[in-house]
Amino acid sequence: HARDAFLLFETLNLKLNLFSSAMKLNTQYMHILHFHLKLKSPTTIQKIIAKLEKNDRIALTDKINANEVFSFGRDHGHFGRILNQAVVSVPSLSLINKNELTGFCFTPQDGNSILSSLAITEWFLYPHSYESKIQCLNPLFFDEV
């Protein structure tokens, strides 16, 4: 994962020091991501949450259990799917020295594969207007899980 992310950011001339690890479990729930980000300037948890709330591809949750998050998706999602790119667990967020953020997020594979495939297809076909064309998906994203 870190190698893929490194290569992606390298296309933007950014050389980031990234680390990842993986643990395989016998479960249908895929990808829970632990993150530790060093921020450029001091901030607060409230400001971080406000920025996350403004991103329509990110959902927030008070849940810390993968079963609850993905069960919500099965019960309320479009054909049982969460199409958001990430579901950030708010209780897991921790700010150290006002500029190091750690936490967990759930990354539903439906959101990653379906949304990314649609976006790249639209970008390929309509490079100057793909953003407006994929806005029809907005009603399928959750603000909160």
Label for each model-derived stretch:
Residues 1-105:
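C-terminal substrate-binding/catalytic lobe of Rossmann-fold NAD(P)-dependent oxidoreductases
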Residues 81-145:
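NAD(P)-dependent Rossmann-like dehydrogenase/reductase catalytic/cofactor-binding core
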